[in-house]
């Protein structure tokens, strides 16, 4: 298994490219994180009250600095999602493997932040596909868990795509969906 924190792979398919988020992505990502329609779908659990709604380039740059520091400290990987048809960043996806003495042991925890116009079932399936295929090898995880609030109907449908993964409710939190292969 390659160490994702030493060499972060570029992932993708015909529609989307996922590459580690860098400072140069800030301007385009600001369009995502200033999208008021998108913010309610962002998972900000354990983020010290940050809801990821940013209005300035400086705020976005500061967040990317944090993501880069988190990568260097092996906390998580954050990829920018590029729409191949436009070449522009349309969101980010974060992942890490959680080791714990509970239901989520060896679980890859995933956060997906998208511009609101990309909150469509087929688009989300296409974005998730390359990462879910590689997650066990990249992170050593046995399953993947993410959150999708009830209002995120398209996202919830995408998390039920017939792709070989089994989707189950994540215990006591009705917004958490877990995927197991």
What is each model feature region?
Residues 1-117, 134, 138-141, 149-154, ...:
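GNAT-family acyltransferases
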Residues 124, 148-149:
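Charged, low-complexity surface patches
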Residues 121-134:
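Conserved acetyl-CoA-binding loop-helix of GNAT-fold acetyltransferases
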């Amino acid at each position: 298994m390659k160490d994702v924190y030493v060499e972060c792979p570029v992932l993708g398919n015909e529609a989307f490219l996922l590459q580690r988020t860098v400072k140069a992505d800030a301007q385009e990502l600001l369009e995502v994180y200033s999208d008021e329609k998108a913010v309610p779908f962002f998972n900000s659990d354990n983020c010290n009250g940050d809801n990821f709604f940013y209005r300035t380039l400086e705020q976005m740059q500061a967040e990317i600095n944090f993501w880069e520091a988190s990568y260097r400290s092996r906390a998580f990987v954050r990829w920018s999602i590029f729409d191949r048809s436009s070449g522009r960043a349309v969101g980010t996806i974060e992942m890490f493997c959680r080791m714990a003495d509970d239901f989520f042991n060896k679980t890859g925890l995933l956060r997906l932040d998208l511009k609101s116009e990309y909150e469509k079932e087929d688009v989300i399936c296409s974005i998730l596909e390359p990462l879910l295929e590689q997650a066990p090898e990249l992170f050593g995880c046995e399953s993947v868990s993410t959150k999708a609030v009830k209002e995120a109907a398209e996202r919830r449908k995408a998390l039920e795509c017939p792709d070989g993964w089994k989707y189950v409710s994540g215990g006591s939190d009705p917004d958490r969906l877990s995927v197991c292969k």
